[in-house]
Regions:
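Conserved, charged catalytic cores of large soluble enzymes
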Residues: 52, 74, 81-97
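Conserved short secondary-structure transition element at the edge of the structured enzyme core
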Residues: 27-40, 74-82
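Residues at alpha-helix termini
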Residues: 1, 37, 61-62, 83
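C-terminal non-catalytic regions of proteins with extracellular/luminal or membrane-system context
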Residues: 2, 11, 17-18, 24, ...
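Short acidic/histidine-rich active-site segments
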Residues: 4-20, 24-25, 33, 37-47
Length: 289
């Protein structure tokens, strides 16, 4: 395909050819296989000295052509030159802060809104109009920014405890984006939310998964928790139109929560997700994901 960039393995995957995938009988054989297959850099070998020894042995034994090593080195060095690392290897703090603190908020909001998928919309519940004067918002992900970000957001399994991230939650976005005269009431407690839903014009329940990545978050059957399914079902029993927003990085079995009046898959919408979800629910953006 003409790709001339750097190819890097995933974490520990060279060793996994021996220990997990059984595709190589030894570590030196695994190193030779990945290098010959086009991998230019191994991400974090468990022991870099062992990797170097295995690589040298494979070259001396003729398992890896020297020209392949030259190619890998050339690609890595070319990338470093393009990035200016030989001129100034340090990050510009001003540029880093500008990116992290939201120089592209408009783009992030646009991308999140356009990636949302409308899975269900019975009786044209969406978009919410000015007729919906009282809207109750609830659910474990309604006011939870880390749940909008997912795994690998600052930390491996998501935002570490004690770290604050600038952004807008769904309930904050709804409050800021609601039409004049529309009251948005956030109710965290499930029982109170069900009680208040009975006198509301609409309910927005935001459900999904906690942040996570491979390992701790692996699941043979990814599904919405029973507690969240029960919450959606109880809200539906009130007779008030229920708009369910799912925030997750993968498809989920929804069970009892699969047939609300409206169902929006918001995925992991990021720091501007609150504004983006509000844009979709209030009809400012057509969900086209």
């Amino acid at each position: 395909w003409g790709f001339d960039g750097v190819v890097i393995s995933d974490w520990d995957d060279v060793e996994y050819l021996v220990t997990k995938y059984r595709a190589a009988a030894s570590y030196p054989e695994a190193v030779a296989k990945v290098i010959n297959a086009g991998v230019d850099m191994a991400m974090v070998p468990p022991d870099d000295r062992e990797f170097h020894q295995a690589l040298l042995k494979a070259i001396k034994d003729g398992l890896i052509p020297r020209k392949r090593i030259d190619e890998a080195v050339r690609r890595v060095l070319t990338l470093k030159f393009k990035l200016g690392l030989f001129d100034d290897p340090y990050v510009d703090p001003a540029k880093a802060d500008k990116i992290v603190l939201g120089a592209d908020k408009k783009l992030a909001r646009k991308a999140a809104a356009e990636s949302a998928v409308l899975l269900r919309n019975e009786n044209d519940v969406l978009p919410l109009t000015a007729k919906a004067r009282k809207i109750v918002v609830t659910g474990p992900s309604a006011d939870n920014l880390p749940n909008q970000l997912g795994g690998w957001s600052i930390g491996w399994q998501g935002v570490p405890d004690g770290v604050e991230v600038p952004g807008t939650t769904v309930v904050e976005g709804l409050k800021k984006g609601a039409p004049a005269g529309t009251k948005i009431s956030y109710v965290a407690d499930a029982d109170k939310a069900v009680a208040q839903a009975k006198s509301a014009d609409a309910v927005v329940v935001v459900v999904g998964e906690k942040p996570g990545a491979e390992g701790e978050s692996d699941a043979p059957r990814p599904a919405l928790s029973a507690e969240q399914q029960d919450l959606v079902a109880r809200l539906q029993d009130t007779g008030t139109p229920v708009i369910e927003v799912v925030l997750a990085g993968r498809p989920l079995v929804l069970g009892k929560a699969s047939e609300p009046d409206a169902l929006l898959m918001g995925w992991l919408p990021g720091t501007e997700g609150g504004h983006a979800i509000a844009d979709v629910l209030f009809g400012k953006v057509n969900p086209s994901g």
